[in-house]
Each structure stands twice: as C-alpha cells, then as structure tokens.
Amino acid sequence: MSYRRGSGPSEEEMIMQQMMIKLSMGISGQCFKECVTSFSSGQMVPQEATCIQSCAKRQQSAFMAMNDIQGQLQAKQGAGMF
C-alpha cells in the first residue's frame, strides 16, 4: 500500500486493517487452543504444526464463505429484494 506524501490510510482502510488483525489473532488463538497440547519441548511437534495449518485454512475458508453470503444479502437488500 502506498500513500501520497503527507497522507495515510483512510478511516475505512484503518478499520478494515484492524478487523483483519482481530480476525487473524482470533484464528491463531482458537487454533492454538485446539492444536497445541504439550509444552514440554519448547517447540511444536509436527502434528501440532499440521493441525494449526489445517485449522487456519478451515477458519479462513469459513470466513470467506460467510463474507460472500453477507455480500449477496447486502446486494439483495440494495436491490429492494428483502
């Protein structure tokens, strides 16, 4: 993202960035709780890393699907169909 000199992101862009950060942190926390079961080695075992990757992909896919549905509903509302 590049901005003209002296300008920064718009308020809408900043809100979107904050929402994406919150979403990312939420996914990370949820997947960590679901997948990391032991703290004995100081490192994740391969199964935990694989679980976290799969969990994050599932969460992201679900978010994208919900986002698409929300967009469709908003389009219908804008067209006076609701």
Curated annotation (Swiss-Prot):
InterPro entries: Tim10-like (IPR004217), Tim10-like_dom_sf (IPR035427). It comes from the Eukaryota. This is Protein C2. Pfam families: zf-Tim10_DDP. Signal peptide: none annotated.
